[in-house]
């Protein structure tokens, strides 16, 4: 099958990949190699003309938007943080579910004056506090968010919370719920026009697989 007819799906390693592969399998699409045991970045599948590329989670939207992939699976947190105006977002896959939260020591979010917020989600945090009319100082971090309140780097953090075990282990707790997060299927706008029939068919299969898992 020619490249013009091939569907390329961008996934990121980790929880999204682990949760997406069973959904694809429900649609009859399986990788021909185990991505966890391979250094390859492009994987063929059992369906001719459908392949998977593995990229960083934050790179899924630009790969899809600029034509490196026809479709992708990205967390709503990534789409909110980095923008998704150039993408179609037709389906909530209902996987990799968690919550975007403000967290910190009890009562830390009620302190008067400018709040110091440590996060890697600076755009989400900025919009959230702007809607509240609250003055904040945003401190960009790339990991170990829970450490910030412990060493006085920030009053609170804005981060993804799943079980909350890491927060509790460090004497922190969820303070404010910003939004629920799950992974979404995103589609390149040009691909949706040029490969409409194939993409529409895959969308239908995935929607059925998602619904079946909800039942």
Curated annotation (Swiss-Prot):
Function comment: Catalyzes the condensation of ATP and 5-phosphoribose 1-diphosphate to form N'-(5'-phosphoribosyl)-ATP (PR-ATP). Has a crucial role in the pathway because the rate of histidine biosynthesis seems to be controlled primarily by regulation of HisG enzymatic activity.
Pathway: Amino-acid biosynthesis; L-histidine biosynthesis; L-histidine from 5-phospho-alpha-D-ribose 1-diphosphate: step 1/9
Gene name linked to the record: hisG
InterPro entries xrefs: ATP_PRibTrfase_cat (IPR013820), ATP_PRibTrfase_CS (IPR018198), ATP_PRibTrfase_HisG (IPR001348), ATP_PRibTrfase_HisG_short (IPR024893)
Organism the protein comes from: Alkalilimnicola ehrlichii (strain ATCC BAA-1101 / DSM 17681 / MLHE-1)
GO CC annotation terms, alphabetical: cytoplasm
NCBIfam families per the UniProt record, alphabetical: hisG
Subunit text: Heteromultimer composed of HisG and HisZ subunits.
Molecular function per GO: ATP binding; ATP phosphoribosyltransferase activity
Protein name per Swiss-Prot or TrEMBL: ATP phosphoribosyltransferase
Catalyzed reactions per annotation: 1-(5-phospho-beta-D-ribosyl)-ATP + diphosphate = 5-phospho-alpha-D-ribose 1-diphosphate + ATP
Subcellular compartments: Cytoplasm
Lineage, broadest ranks: Bacteria, Pseudomonadati, Pseudomonadota, Gammaproteobacteria, Chromatiales
Protein family (similarity comment): Belongs to the ATP phosphoribosyltransferase family. Short subfamily.
Keywords for this protein: Amino-acid biosynthesis, ATP-binding, Cytoplasm, Glycosyltransferase, Histidine biosynthesis, Nucleotide-binding, Transferase
Signal peptide start and end residues: none
An example Gene Ontology biological process: L-histidine biosynthetic process
Group of enzyme by EC: transferase
UniProt note: domains: Lacks the C-terminal regulatory region which is replaced by HisZ.
UniProt EC number: 2.4.2.17
A Pfam family the protein falls into: HisG
CDD domains: PBP2_HisGs (cd13595)
């Amino acid at each position: 099958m020619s490249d013009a007819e091939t569907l390329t799906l961008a996934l990121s390693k980790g929880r999204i990949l682990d949760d997406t592969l069973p959904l694809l399998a429900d649609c009859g699409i399986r990788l021909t190699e185990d991505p966890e045991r391979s250094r390859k970045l492009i994987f063929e599948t059992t369906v001719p003309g459908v392949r998977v590329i593995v990229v960083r989670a934050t790179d899924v939207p630009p790969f899809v938007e600029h034509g490196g992939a026809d479709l992708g699976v990205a967390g709503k947190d990534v789409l909110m943080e980095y923008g998704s105006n150039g993408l179609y977002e037709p389906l909530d896959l209902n996987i990799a579910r968690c919550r975007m939260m403000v967290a910190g020591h009890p009562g830390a979010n009620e302190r008067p004056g400018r709040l110091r917020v440590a996060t890697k989600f600076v755009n989400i945090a900025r919009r959230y506090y702007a809607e509240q009319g609250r003055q904040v100082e945003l401190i960009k971090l790339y990991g170990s968010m829970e450490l910030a309140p412990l060493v006085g780097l920030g009053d609170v953090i804005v981060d993804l919370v799943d079980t909350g075990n890491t927060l509790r282990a460090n004497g922190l707790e969820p303070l404010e719920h910003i939004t629920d997060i799950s992974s979404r299927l995103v589609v390149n706008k040009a691909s949706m026009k040029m490969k409409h029939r194939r993409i529409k068919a895959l969308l239908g299969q995935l929607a059925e697989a998602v619904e079946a898992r909800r039942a």
